[in-house]
Amino acid sequence: MYPHLTSIGIEQPEAIERYSLRQEAANDILKVYFAKNKGELFAKSVKFKFPRQRKSVLVNSGSREYKEITEINRTLTHIIDELDIITKRKHTEVDIKKKILGDLRHLERVVSHKISEIEADLEKLK
């Protein structure tokens, strides 16, 4: 399902919680964090180093001046796409759970208030 993550040795992509990406010299450093298991103090993480691709870009066509630039490795782009799918899906699930819990708490308050109102009306009848 996640061929690029599998190709770099990640056997359980569903356990990924988040990731970070930074540039260091001529490399991009990808750090993948996994969900913390019960009893662990720190979450497990793995680090990958991807060399940036170098390109010569024409700056001035009149003088035929070129400038060397670097850009993200194509493989890393595919890996990030897969990581985004995994992490966004988890965030969506968490957001839905928060919404449901919020709705439930609101319903509890409404019902509690209504019960108090009915009890007050009953007291008036005595």
Curated annotation (Swiss-Prot):
Signal peptide: none annotated. Pfam families: DUF3461 (PF11944). InterPro entries: UPF0325. HAMAP family: UPF0325. Belongs to the UPF0325 family. This is UPF0325 protein PBPRA2971. It comes from Photobacterium profundum (strain SS9).
